[in-house]
Regions:
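Signature of lipid phosphatidyltransferase scaffolds
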Residues: 123, 127-192
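Bacterial N-terminal signal peptides
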Residues: 9-21
Length: 192
């Protein structure tokens, strides 16, 4: 075998290993919702309100007050709620974030990636909510989006493992009033 052919096969093997997908046998049930005005937010709120143990969220964008309220209520009734946001969240309006902070929901910023574009909830280790739908008002009322609610323990286990992977490299968030980068004057050191 020539060196170039050997090198090609080695590269092909590495690429196939790195891009391997996981095949899961279909089990459980799936519901689909579309927007605008197709019930995506209501479906998500329903699932969060049905949670009894945990709701782990990965969100690129987050301005939906109904979803924020549902997460807050879940936390207050003892459900473990934690949210990983894309670092760009700090530039969005903070009304939904304020609801989470007031409820004591821990949240984290994923700065490991250029964009943390996930839109996922893993609920009670058995339900996955995912799709193109950002957890925003615009996604419900203006955008063409979709949400899948998948009840499948094996799939939820895979998503939960991915959530934990991202949580491991994410940094704890700070209160909304301190999200902005330090100003030049706030970085000055006072000298005695």
């Amino acid at each position: 075998m020539r060196l170039s052919e050997c090198l090609f096969r080695s590269i092909l093997f590495c690429v196939s290993v790195l891009t391997a997908s996981v095949s899961l046998r279909a089990a459980g049930t799936t519901q689909v919702f579309f927007s605008p005005e197709g019930g995506c937010t209501d479906a998500i709120v329903h699932e969060v309100r049905s949670a009894s143990r945990s709701v782990h969220v990965q969100a690129f964008s987050f301005t939906s007050l109904p979803i924020a309220r549902a997460l807050s209520e879940a936390s207050k009734r003892g459900v473990e709620v934690a949210v990983i946001f894309d670092q760009g969240i700090v530039q969005e309006p903070h009304a939904a974030m304020d609801i989470l902070v007031a409820a004591g929901v821990p949240w984290f910023l994923d700065r490991e990636h250029s964009i943390a574009h996930n839109k996922v909830m893993v609920i009670d280790d058995s339900v996955v909510v995912t799709g193109s739908f950002n957890f925003t008002t615009a996604a419900e009322h203006h955008n063409a989006e979709n949400v899948l609610v998948i009840r499948d323990v094996d799939l939820a286990t895979r998503y939960q493992a991915n959530w934990k992977l991202h949580r491991a490299h994410s940094q704890p968030g700070t209160l909304p009033g301190t999200l902005a980068a330090p100003t030049r004057s706030s970085r000055r050191v006072r000298r005695p």
